[in-house]
């Protein structure tokens, strides 16, 4: 393994933008950008999948994936720099999924529908935006909680890029009812308006986080999804109080590190089925890596990479 590949793996600490340097000829870089980003497990699972892919096709032996801590204010100058340095694909997490939209040359149908981007693919005219979060969420819910979105009743907490993708995927997959709430009423209203334009308003209901409507509390087998960043820090409060809901709720926290958040601790207390977002992370990552390589990607290898 050469030095540049060691650097790109960055399994313990992320690079800053100032530390991003041109890669040696023949090397291809991939990375996740976010702020904060230290918690991200993406390098472990992507590099494990790339290692498995290289065993089938040696052309990928010089591909590596890292993580870069990037403030929102630096996104505009960062995107051309990554291409110049030899990066052909990027993932985006908080706070970049919506803010990146005006910086892209094009976006795919899913990203347009969801109003958010989590995957960038370099094309001749610049960065092309895609969204694999919706796919990852649906696959993760099925794998971790045996939840099918069709005919499900779903409550999403959040109004950022991840919440937009989750809400659009639920509606597109024919959920029966979608409730959505957020701390910021302005952002909540904006998301609901976009969703209503795309899917109609019949299945969508929003409400203030502090004022849970009675009807949602009575739903059987409600699926509760945390699409906020609350849970990344040990001191973070629970994004929504579960005590008033039925105990047959299924609770899914998109946060995966730490693996047991305040929300999931509360779900366990009330004996609710629950899971963290690792399964979503893995499935969205596999889809992204397929976009970059045009190859079949091993989900099993990604899980092995995280566990190692």
Question: Over which residues does each language-model region extend?
Answer:
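Adenosine-phosphate binding glycine-rich loop
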Residues: 151, 250, 254-308
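Rossmann-like adenosine-cofactor binding region
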Residues: 202-274
């Amino acid at each position: 393994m050469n030095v540049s590949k060691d650097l790109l793996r960055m399994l313990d600490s992320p690079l800053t933008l100032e530390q991003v340097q041109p890669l040696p000829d023949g090397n291809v870089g991939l990375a996740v950008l976010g702020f904060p980003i230290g918690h991200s497990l993406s390098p472990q699972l992507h590099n494990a999948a790339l290692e498995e892919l290289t065993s089938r096709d040696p052309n990928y032996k010089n591909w590596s994936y890292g993580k870069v801590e990037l403030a929102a204010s630096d996104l505009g100058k960062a995107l051309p720099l990554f291409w110049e340095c030899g990066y052909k694909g990027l993932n985006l997490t908080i706070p970049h999924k919506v803010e990146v939209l005006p910086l892209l040359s094009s976006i795919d149908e899913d990203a347009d529908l969801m109003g958010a981007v989590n995957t960038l693919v370099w094309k001749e005219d610049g960065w092309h935006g895609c969204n694999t979060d919706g796919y990852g969420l649906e696959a993760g819910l099925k794998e971790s909680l045996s939840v099918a979105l069709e005919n499900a009743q779903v409550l999403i907490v959040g109004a950022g890029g991840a919440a937009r993708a989750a809400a659009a995927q639920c509606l597109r997959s024919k959920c029966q009812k979608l409730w959505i709430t957020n701390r910021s009423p302005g952002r909540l209203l904006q998301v609901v308006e976009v969703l209503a334009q795309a899917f109609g308003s019949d299945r969508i209901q929003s409400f203030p986080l502090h004022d849970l409507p009675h009807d949602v509390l009575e739903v059987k087998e409600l699926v509760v999804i945390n699409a906020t960043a609350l849970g990344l820090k040990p001191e973070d409060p629970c994004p929504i109080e579960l005590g008033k809901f039925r105990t047959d709720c299924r609770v899914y926290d998109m946060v995966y590190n730490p693996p047991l958040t305040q929300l999931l601790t509360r779900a366990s207390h009330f004996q609710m089925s629950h899971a963290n977002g690792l399964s979503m992370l893995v499935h969205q990552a596999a889809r992204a890596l397929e976009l970059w390589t045009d190859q079949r990607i091993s989900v099993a290898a990604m899980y092995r990479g995280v566990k190692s």
